[in-house]
Amino acid sequence: MSYVIDRRLNGKNKSTVNRQRFLRRYREHIKKAVEEAVSRRSIMDMEHGEQISIPGRDIDEPVLHHGRGGKQTIVHPGNKEFTAGEHIPRPQGGGGGGGGRGKAGNSGEGMDEFVFQITQEEFLEFMFEDLELPNLVKRHLTGADTFKTVRAGIANEGNPSRINIVRTLRSAHARRIALTGSSRALLREAQKELDRLRVEEPDNFTDIQEVEQEIERLKARINRLPFLDTFDLKYNLLVKQPNPSSKAVMFCLMDVSGSMTQATKDIAKRFFILLYLFLKRNYDRIEVVFIRHHTSAREVDEEEFFYSRETGGTIVSSALKLMQEIMAERYPASDWNIYAAQASDGDNWNDDSPICRDILSKQIMPHVQYYTYVEITPREHQALWYEYERIGEAYPDTFAQQQLVSAGDIYPVFRELFQRRLAT
């Protein structure tokens, strides 16, 4: 029984190419719809895509036609209503055919919006388009688990799917020439002798018959040699080479002190969920370190970071000190691209804010690729914000700070912080 194996890239989804072309064409409409969806839905609600609506006027194909207005002379075959010289009244413009709410119209026509669904993968692709971790430059072989397959010559053994047909046939041809060389030489001599006998001694049937038998014997010997032997088989040799990979670590520092209201904590968690989703989708080799802090800081796992209800006073420097210790112990700056994202409401013990600036400027900023700080407050900024502004003046390319007032600000601020930079 024969089996047909479908190895096409699209498989059964024959319209995949057309769908991708459609998504590229209406990219701006889809991006706008995705941004609106992110602002109104929960960041954790990513199990499905989004329903996209495109106005009917935007999906019309451009066509060449006569413009409205002007004078035209047209012959209508079989016209019984009008005669030459009469004026045909101009058709009225459309009025009541649009899709939407409003009063009914008695004339005109319109077109409903085109609505379609994008998948979860497509939703995330548009959501994180043009975003990246800045300054991801350090690449090392240490601990690399990524490899690339490269050609490494020809081998005598290997997988049948990697057989080199040209080299195999060349080897078989060389073997046949080498093993049949003497027989072919004798065959040529016998053929010459037969030709001579047929011309000079045509009646010498005995010698002619003997030479013919010798020729047949030599041909049989040559033909017994197999056209292809296992010795001839040659295979493309492929080897895996370690591929230098960018190792990165992201420190997530979240304030869970008593001054953070439940609404403020929810905004902070949504920001970090969006960041975590972005990292895990776009980067294969990246580690995330979660740090919660109030008067003291602790490294926690993902579950505790997002769902623990522990709270207390506010000493922001405790989180920065812990981050510096973890960097020194596990993530040397010579091998790792180090990033950090900090979220707080800005409330801090007054004497602690200068300490935070000192730790950042001397122990952290010289070793990180990028540090972001988001302050979640509708009020005026406090001392911590102004201390961090001084950090931004000293490190304008690797430090950024933004303010969040409501949940609707999360996605725009996130895009602002991680917008892809043009190479300089």
UniProtKB/Swiss-Prot annotation:
InterPro entries: UPF0229 (IPR006698), vWFA_dom_sf (IPR036465). Residues 81-107 are annotated as: Disordered. This is UPF0229 protein PputGB1_0427. SUPFAM superfamilies: vWA-like. Residues 92-107 have a biased composition (Gly residues). Pfam families: DUF444. Belongs to the UPF0229 family.
